[in-house]
């Protein structure tokens, strides 16, 4: 937490483009005080990997099962090359009904790699909802 590794290393290492100093300052702003960085330590530990932690893995699994049968409109923003949602997971998402898919350039924090394309896609998708 002392080094603010999530903001200083994980974030810039997970984008295709180099964030500007102004952008980095915005990410740093809420975490200037080391004690305020606790969420950046806790949250990654809650990401389910190989079924652990089980409570979170169960929630994710139940939600994925629901999305696979729900007719609720969905917008799938596929990132190329992507980072986490690739391979089998990407293919699974593509099977969901009533879904629009777009492709943008991006790795993990895709809003930083393709902000305008994502904003335009979300706006158009929302306008086309019936």
Tell me what each language-model feature is.
Residues 1-47, 54:
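Helix-rich cap/lid subdomain of alpha/beta-hydrolase
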Residues 9, 26, 42, 62, ...:
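Alpha-helical elements of Rossmann-like donor-binding domains used by nucleotide-donor carbohydrate transfer enzymes
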Residues 18, 36-94, 101:
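Conserved serine/cysteine hydrolase catalytic core
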Residues 29, 79, 104-106:
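Active-site donor-binding loop signature of nucleotide-sugar glycosyltransferases
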Residues 32, 68, 127-130:
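Residue-level signal for alpha-helix termini/capping positions
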Residues 97-130:
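Catalytic active-site module of serine/aspartate enzymes centered on a nucleophile-bearing elbow/loop
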């Amino acid at each position: 937490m002392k080094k603010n590794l999530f903001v200083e290393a994980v974030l810039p290492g997970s984008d295709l483009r180099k964030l500007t100093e102004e952008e980095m300052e915005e990410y740093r702003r809420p975490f200037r005080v080391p004690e305020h960085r606790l969420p950046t330590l806790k949250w990654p530990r809650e990401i389910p990997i190989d079924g652990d932690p089980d409570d979170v893995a169960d929630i994710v699994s139940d939600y994925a099962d629901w999305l696979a049968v729900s007719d609720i409109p969905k917008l799938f923003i596929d990132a190329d090359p992507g980072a986490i949602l690739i391979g089998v997971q990407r293919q699974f998402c593509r099977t969901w009904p009533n879904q629009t898919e777009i492709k943008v350039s991006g790795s993990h924090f895709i809003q930083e790699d393709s902000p305008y394309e994502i904003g335009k896609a979300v706006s158009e998708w929302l306008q086309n909802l019936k």
